[in-house]
Design a protein with these regions (language model features):
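ATPase catalytic-site recognition across NTP-hydrolyzing enzymes
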Residues: 150-212, 226
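Walker B catalytic acidic pair
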Residues: 81-82
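Nucleic-acid-processing active sites and adjacent nucleic-acid-binding tracks
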Residues: 225-253
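Conserved RecA-like ASCE P-loop NTPase motor core of nucleic-acid helicases/translocases
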Residues: 2-14
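Inter-Walker segment of RecA-like/P-loop motor cores
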Residues: 15-76
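ASCE P-loop NTPase helicase motor core
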Residues: 85-156, 160, 164
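Residues immediately C-terminal
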Residues: 13, 85, 217
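Short, flexible loop/turn motifs enriched in small residues
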Residues: 205, 216-223
Length: 253
């Protein structure tokens, strides 16, 4: 059988909210009770054909800060539920675990489904921004789905959302707005903060410059930067140092 996973930051949330939905779907499909079983000790569903659906607890562990425990798994496909709760490293390691269990045997492409409300974690940069700009890679897909699109939701639930939610939360959860915290009075635009780590918008400049914060014998470091236009390409620092040492370093740059 094939191997699938359903991942969430807290396993308890999967038990409380996702397992009842799985039972509902199995019943809608008309599968008899003996066609599957749930192993509550190891947290997986096993189907009549041997395929398994593992429920994964993806909370942060100080002993595994980069979530490497997921990278060694062998999965056919997977699903990240509430992707807005996930860090990039957990998403990345879950992603590399798919396509490794009987995909070739059953001619199945490795696929990862992520469901989430609008958030400003890796989803914003990896999916929403490229989708909006028309640059999303062909092997990825972004599907914007609003509560109004779900025909299974009771009308009273939608009405309750409309009455209860306010401000940014209403824009985010009801109308699917990803730029929900863009404030025109904010000191820095959120997209500009993200761009700090890439600076793709800065034109290439052939002129180079040097800046130096000379600390000498103070408690601060002496910091020297080499710039190509507005791009900082080198950083050098010195502990307590004489002017001759600083001059010597500058002459080598």
């Amino acid at each position: 059988g094939t191997h699938y996973f359903i991942a969430r930051k807290q396993l308890n949330d999967l038990r409380k909210f996702t397992i009842p939905s799985i039972h509902e779907v199995l019943n809608l499909w008309g599968l008899p009770a003996d066609a599957w079983r749930y192993n509550g000790q190891d947290n997986y569903f096993e189907m009549y054909n041997g395929s398994k659906i593992f429920l994964l607890d993806c909370k942060y562990l100080p002993s595994d800060p980069q979530y490497q425990r997921f990278g060694s798994m062998q999965m056919t496909r997977g699903w990240i539920e509430e992707g807005g709760e996930f860090e990039f490293d957990s998403y990345s390691n879950l992603k590399i675990s798919i396509g490794r269990w009987k995909n070739k045997e059953y001619n199945l492409k490795g696929k990862l489904l992520i469901t989430a409300n609008p958030s400003k974690n890796f989803l914003y940069k990896e999916f929403y921004q490229p989708y909006k700009a028309g640059t999303l890679e062909r092997w990825k897909a972004f599907i914007q789905a609003l509560p109004y699109d779900n025909k299974m939701l009771p009308k009273a639930y939608i009405e309750n959302l409309e009455r209860t939610l306010r401000g940014a939360e209403k824009q985010r959860l009801l109308h699917g707005l990803w730029e929900y915290d863009d404030d025109p009075t904010a000191l820095c635009d959120y997209d500009k903060i993200l761009a700090i780590f890439e600076n793709d918008q800065i034109p290439t400049d052939k002129e180079t410059y040097l800046t130096a914060d000379i600390a000498r014998f103070g408690s601060d470091l002496c910091v020297i930067g080499v710039w190509r236009g507005w791009e900082l390409i080198e950083i050098h620092s010195l502990d307590i140092s004489a002017m001759t040492e600083v001059q010597g370093l500058i002459h080598t740059l």
